[in-house]
């Protein structure tokens, strides 16, 4: 069996009503990064913490790109949970 080590980071996305792409720098040094996006309401107010589905790409070893189909409004925030894996 292989032991897997993990490192975590949490980043908040704040909508502005126009941007659909968000580059999130993690500096983990790898593309082996798990990404989960949670509904965080309006800076936590009214947050459901439900998983939100969006496209995620890993352009390089330092960041991930989250791409929403529709731009989040200025009153909608998301909490992005990032986990680095080392195999």
For each feature predicted by the language model, list its residue ranges.
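Extracellular attachment/recognition segments
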Residues: 1-87
């Amino acid at each position: 069996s292989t032991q897997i080590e993990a490192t975590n980071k949490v980043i908040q996305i704040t909508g502005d009503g126009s941007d659909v792409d968000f580059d999130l720098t993690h500096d983990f040094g790898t593309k082996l990064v798990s990404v989960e996006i949670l509904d965080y309401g309006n800076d936590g107010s009214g947050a459901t913490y439900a998983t939100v589905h969006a496209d995620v790409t890993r352009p390089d070893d330092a960041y991930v790109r989250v791409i929403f189909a529709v731009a989040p409004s200025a009153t909608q925030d998301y909490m992005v949970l990032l986990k680095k894996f080392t195999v």
